[in-house]
């Protein structure tokens, strides 16, 4: 998918925003905040996928509208929830040093990088709306398996330091990129 065709913000494409996050991530690694290559690669995956849910037609209409348009909770799903459908488990599993929960950890960081809703509840209760929102990109998304739910529950319900670090570094990169810091 060409992410230069989709807007993350009125003045920035999704790809430009991802590139900004990756620049911040590289700075964090250079400064010694991220001490392992596998953790760096997992955060990189989270940075890449975190806003891809913004490719939906409704989000693109809103972000490019001349007059402010508000999120329609009856017709739309928050982008952090939609973004998880783009996370490629095979890409995560290719990371040297990964373990079996790393896919769930990356998904956890992506899904919870905003507090717009309860992502799991939204996925379980709004399946039809999710399908509608993702209809035009259905060939780009992945189905969430039962294994995903089991592993996510384990990551979410215990204090999984690796998941917390991935989410924390994603936040640091996203907030500093969005605010043009660093």
Task: Show which residues each predicted segment covers.
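Metal-dependent phosphohydrolase cores
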Residues: 1-182
